[in-house]
C-alpha cells in the first residue's frame, strides 16, 4: 500500500466575495456580464437587455429564440457587420468564442464558458468573432439572440464553419 499522499495544489480564486469573476474575458470587445435574477412573490424576473450595459451602441433590430437538442452543437459562425447578444434562457449551454480578427490585439485567443439560467449571463459578440454553442445537458437548451441588424434572407451576414472544424482551435465537448 502506498503511503505517499496524492499531489495537491491550492485552488485559485475565480470569483470575488460578491461572486464577480476575477479574470476578464480576454478577447478584445467581447463582453460577458452576469445579470441578477429578481425573486418576487409570483416567481422570478430576469432583465435581458438594457442599453446602459453596453459600451458600444447597440440597437435591437432582430430577436430570435433558438433551441438546441441534447448533445447538439451549432455551426461556428461570425458576422462581418452584425453584432450579437446571446442570452441563454434554458438548459446548460457551453459557448465557445474565438478571435479570428487578424488586426485584433487578442487575435488567436479563445474562451469557453458554461451558462445556465440559475446564474444568468449574456455574451456580447462583436463582428468578426467566431462563436458556437453546445447543449451539454440532458434536456433541450434554449437561448435568445438579439441582433443590431435585421436578418437579410437573400444575403445573410453569416459566415460558417462546421462544429468540428479544425480551423477553430476550440473544443466544446
Kindly give the residue locations of the regions a language model identified:
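Non-catalytic, conserved peripheral segments adjacent to functional cores
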Residues: 1-119, 136-173
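Beta-rich strand-turn-strand
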Residues: 119-124, 129-137
Amino acid at each position: 500500500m502506498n503511503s505517499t499522499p496524492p499531489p495537491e495544489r491550492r485552488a485559485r480564486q475565480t470569483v470575488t466575495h460578491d461572486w464577480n469573476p476575477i479574470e476578464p474575458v480576454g478577447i478584445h470587445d467581447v463582453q460577458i456580464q452576469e445579470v441578477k435574477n429578481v425573486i418576487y412573490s409570483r416567481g422570478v424576473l430576469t432583465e435581458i437587455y438594457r442599453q446602459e450595459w453596453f459600451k458600444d451602441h447597440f440597437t435591437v433590430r432582430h430577436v430570435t429564440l433558438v433551441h438546441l437538442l441534447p448533445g447538439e452543437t451549432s455551426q461556428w459562425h461570425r458576422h462581418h457587420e452584425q453584432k450579437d447578444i446571446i442570452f441563454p434562457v434554458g438548459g446548460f449551454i457551453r459557448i465557445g468564442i474565438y478571435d479570428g480578427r487578424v488586426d485584433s490585439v487578442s487575435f488567436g485567443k479563445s474562451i469557453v464558458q458554461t451558462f445556465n439560467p440559475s446564474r444568468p449571463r449574456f455574451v456580447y459578440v462583436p463582428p468578426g468573432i467566431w462563436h458556437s454553442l453546445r447543449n451539454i445537458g440532458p434536456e433541450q437548451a434554449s437561448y435568445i439572440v438579439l441582433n443590431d441588424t435585421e436578418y437579410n434572407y437573400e444575403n445573410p451576414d453569416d459566415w460558417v464553419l462546421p462544429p468540428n472544424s479544425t480551423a477553430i482551435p476550440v473544443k466544446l465537448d
